[in-house]
Design a protein with these regions (language model features):
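Conserved G/P- and acidic residue-centered "switch" motifs that form tight phosphate/ATP-binding loops
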Residues: 28, 98, 139
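Primarily recognizes the serine-hydrolase "nucleophile elbow" in alpha/beta-hydrolase
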Residues: 46, 123-165
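Generic beta-strand/beta-sheet core signal
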Residues: 33-36, 50, 94, 138-140, ...
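N-terminal cap/lid segment of alpha/beta-hydrolase-fold proteins
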Residues: 3-42, 46
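Cap/lid segment of the alpha/beta-hydrolase catalytic domain
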Residues: 41-126
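A general structural signal for stabilizing positions within well-ordered secondary structure
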Residues: 12, 38, 83, 127-129, ...
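Short alpha-helical segments and helix-capping/turn motifs at coil-helix boundaries
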Residues: 31-35, 76-79, 144-149
């Protein structure tokens, strides 16, 4: 895709941040999420990702990295909330159970809870007044892998996933 005729959407919105909102999983465990959303009324499409590293590590003020650089040169694997929210998306970054501010014990990587917890949070997002119910998964590396696990559970409001790297 070398044609330069594509157009990148322009930033339109400022961002509202709501930290450590607790979402109840199907087994009663409370999962901590941070919500990033446009500062305007209305419903917006959603983006979701879940972190085994702690959601707070995904919003460092990291300067742009050089093209072709390694993923290890960047801190944000979830995607940049400021970029997406400014363009009309709401974004939720969650702590995996037993990690960061979420309750419970971490059952280990690649457990059934990654899919179930992702499903439950996506469906919670769809019920919020700021989300239009169209939700996509985003992220690189482990964040990309968890999208596959979550998609396998077939949340009704998950419309697409975009794992990369």
């Amino acid at each position: 895709m070398t044609d330069k005729s594509y157009h990148l959407s322009q930033p339109t919105y400022k961002m509202i941040v709501e930290e450590n909102i607790m979402v109840t999983a199907r087994d009663g465990v409370k999962l901590a999420v941070d919500v990033y959303r446009p500062d305007a009324p209305g419903e917006f499409p959603g983006l979701f990702t879940i972190s085994v590293y702690g959601k707070s590590t995904q919003t460092f003020d990291t300067p742009p990295q050089p093209f072709g650089g390694s993923v290890f040169e960047a801190a944000i694997e979830a995607g940049d909330p400021e970029f997406f929210v400014a363009r009309g998306y709401c974004m939720v970054i969650a702590d995996y159970r037993g990690i960061g501010d979420s309750e419970g014990e971490m059952p280990g990587m690649f457990s059934k809870y990654e899919g179930e917890d992702g499903y439950d949070i996506i469906e919670w997002m769809a019920e919020q007044p700021w989300c239009n119910g169209n939700i996509g998964g985003v992220g690189i590396c482990y964040f990309g892998f968890t999208q596959l696990i979550i998609a396998e559970t077939q949340p009704p409001h998950l419309k697409c996933i975009a794992p990369w790297e």
